[in-house]
Amino acid sequence: MNIRDLEYLVALAEHRHFRRAADSCHVSQPTLSGQIRKLEDELGVMLLERTSRKVLFTQAGLLLVDQARTVLREVKVLKEMASQQGETMSGPLHIGLIPTVGPYLLPHIIPMLHQTFPKLEMYLHEAQTHQLLAQLDSGKLDCVILALVKESEAFIEVPLFDEPMMLAIYEDHPWANRDSVPMSDLAGEKLLMLEDGHCLRDQAMGFCFEAGADEDTHFRATSLETLRNMVAAGSGITLLPALAVPPERKRDGVVYLPCIKPEPRRTIGLVYRPGSPLRSRYEQLAEAIRGSMDGHFDSALKQAV
């Protein structure tokens, strides 16, 4: 038995599919399947109930998966401790980002991070909040950049910046010539939203409910770009995070307006595991990002108005 065997087992437990598990481990399906069988032979116990339709773990298999996750987390800590003995800001770093942050934040910070930390090898992973936090907990990710939510409170949260939400409306909407929109004016309106699983959906829904608005249930988008295109087509209005808003007040059939009284905002933060030996690395990374984004939204909102 070795660490790689445990990684195969955990991957199979996560994906419940041999091919997808093999792909995630960057090996062939026969290789992964063969190693699982060898592990069973070595332990003298069946870990899987083999059926043609799905992967089912035996009780012994489930217990071993739980222990394997613990072992892999400890291995991650050992690697971090070893890394700490060298240069703090060097070597590989796996960063997770949510889809409503990654595409819009990365162009602002990646050039700066490469210049500030040239020896840092960054690997970027995009997924929804619950998936990123699970991967962070298992040790697959080193840190995560997301909108801080209740689920992230179990980790160390380092706030980076507060991001305003802006109203996106189609160009012939009655509000198109306004400079801003009080949140109270949204009362009775129905707004387009992202599908379930996006933390931005829950946050935007909260802002809407407080203002007396509701969700347009005829359509749920998979991405911010889909929302934007639906607004441009005149299918509705929505709230978009400021990083996803262009510098122009109006572009491609969409008008972007600041929301006021109150201004809806979400806090973007960097999250990492408690007790990580590489705390200094994550804190330095957060400080660099915070400095890079300082004042960004003040100037962006002035341009929009």
Each predicted region: which residue ranges?
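Flexible hinge/capping segments at coil-to-helix
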Residues: 152-191
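C-terminal effector-binding regulatory domain of bacterial HTH transcription factors
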Residues: 242-254, 261-305
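Hydrophobic hinge/microswitch elements
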Residues: 128-141, 146-147, 195-257
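Short helix-boundary/capping micro-motifs
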Residues: 10-28, 52
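Residues within helix-turn-helix
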Residues: 18-23, 30, 37, 133, ...
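Central regulatory/effector-binding core of bacterial HTH transcription factors
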Residues: 90-153, 221-223
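Secondary-structure junction motif
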Residues: 175, 190-211, 278-287, 292-302
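A short LG(V/I)-centered, amphipathic sequence patch enriched
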Residues: 40-57
